[in-house]
Design a protein with these regions (language model features):
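Conserved H-loop
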Residues: 4-10
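Conserved ABC ATPase "signature" C-loop
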Residues: 29-30
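Short, glycine/charged-rich "phosphate-handling" switch motifs in NTP-dependent
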Residues: 23, 35
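Short acidic-hydrophobic catalytic motif
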Residues: 39-43, 51
Length: 172
């Protein structure tokens, strides 16, 4: 409170950065890969490495199909969206707490999955799935006191909400 100047804080703790820094600059091998207001950079990182640094657990290769559609190659899923897709799209990011668990894979923008493993923790459950039509792993984290904390069944699909989808490019 008594200090009126600016300071540079170097940290490897994303929680510390989010809590204390109004603005952030992310570096990788001496190059800036993300910068701006901290909350905005965490909300919408622009590229794969920045998404990883902000804690995004689900990053998958993707390509633009049209002005409003993409194909998530790693998950075998085509999505149609209202927003325009950037030409240089290379991947998507999706935060592990943001999925909507479904009992069937028939819903729009849902990836059918099969359970690989599950971890019970004091305050959350961690689910690790494999997409039925793709490769890789999808992490879904459920807070015990959250909206899905009392889930009775293992989800058969995970729905992606457009407003939560991170469209990542290789450029900053």
């Amino acid at each position: 409170e008594d200090f009126s100047g600016q300071a540079i804080m170097v940290s490897h703790s994303r929680d510390e950065i989010y809590r204390f820094a109004e603005e952030v600059i992310m570096l990788q091998e001496g190059k800036v890969i993300g910068q701006g207001e901290t909350k905005e950079v965490f909300r919408q990182p622009k590229n794969r490495q920045a998404a990883i640094l902000t804690g995004c657990k689900n990053i998958a290769n993707a390509k633009k199909l049209g002005e409003h559609s993409i194909f998530i190659e790693d998950w075998g899923l085509e999505l149609t969206m209202e927003r325009e897709i950037p030409d240089k799209l290379s991947a998507i990011g999706y935060r592990a707490h943001d999925f909507v668990p479904l009992c069937s894979g028939e819903e729009e923008n849902a990836v059918p999955v099969k359970l690989l493993s599950k971890a019970e923790l004091p305050f959350e459950q961690n689910f690790y799935f494999q997409p039925e039509k793709g490769e890789g792993e999808i992490c879904f984290l459920v807070q015990r006191d959250g909206p899905y904390g009392k889930m009775q069944e293992i989800p058969k699909a995970l729905q992606l909400r457009e407003e939560k989808l991170l469209l990542l490019t290789e450029e900053n």
